Every structure is written in structure tokens, then in C-alpha cells.
Amino acid sequence: MLHMHIASWVLLIILFFAAYFNFSEKQGASPYFKPIHMLLRLFMLLVLISGFWVWIQSFSSGAAGGHMLLTLKMICGVAVVALMEVTITKRKKGQPSHGLMWTTIVVIILTMIIGIILPMGPITQMFGL
């Protein structure tokens, strides 16, 4: 389930940038915007469901520590999904969205850093921490 979660958030980030840049402030939406936005929403659901599943598995396995970080990552993940949707919606309505775009990028990076240092993350597994 962890591999599906990682693959879905990688595709989610790619689709977010594709949707954001397929909507021009002057010309409006490109013909590809609506399908990309629908795929973006589908992958948002996949990320949330798989992330919640990983969260449940981690708590039920009784793994030593990391529960506070895992809960923080879950909150950051929900914030990323919410920020992505609000950013695309503001861009679609013609309102300024550059600040939200940068906020979304910062929260994405923060969420990825938390995910990397979690007990199931690559850094922890690589060094046996």
C-alpha cells in the first residue's frame, strides 16, 4: 500500500502543475484542463485513501514510535490536498493564486520531508534508525 501511496502522490503533484499551467489568466482553460482537473481530483482521493490506510496499518502494527510524526504528516497531507484544490479554483475564477501556489509548494516539501524521516521512510530504513 505504501508504494501505491507514493506513486499516487507523485502523479498528483505532476497533475497539479499540469492543471495549474493549463489555465491561462488571459485565454481561460485549455481543452485539456477539465480532464486533467478530474484526474487531479481522482488522484487526490487515491492519495487520501492510501495515506489513511498506511496510517491505520502503522497504528495497528504497534511500530515503535513515529505516531506523532505520522499524524502530523497526515494533517499536512490533507492540507496539501486542500491547498491544491483551492489554488486551482482561484486560478479558474481569475483571482490571484500565485501566493497559494507557493504555499502549496512549501507544504508539499514539508510533507515529503516528514514522510522521508518516518519509520517507514527511506532514510530510516537505509540507516536502520
Curated annotation (Swiss-Prot):
Q: Which UniProt keywords apply?
A: Cell membrane, Membrane, Transmembrane, Transmembrane helix
Q: Give the subcellular location.
A: Cell membrane
Q: How does it sit in the membrane?
A: Multi-pass membrane protein
Give the matching Pfam families: DUF1516
Top-level taxon of origin: Bacteria
- Can you tell me where the transmembrane regions are? 1-21, 36-56, 68-88, 100-120
Is Transmembrane there in the keyword field?
yes
RNA-binding among the record's keywords? no
Q: Per the annotation, which location comes first and is thus the protein's main one?
A: membrane
Q: What cellular-component terms does GO give this entry?
A: plasma membrane
Q: Which cysteines are joined by disulfide bonds?
A: none
Q: Which family does it belong to?
A: Belongs to the UPF0344 family.
Q: What is this protein called?
A: UPF0344 protein SSP1805
What organism is recorded for this protein?
Staphylococcus saprophyticus subsp. saprophyticus (strain ATCC 15305 / DSM 20229 / NCIMB 8711 / NCTC 7292 / S-41)
Its lineage opens with: Bacteria, Bacillati, Bacillota, Bacilli, Bacillales
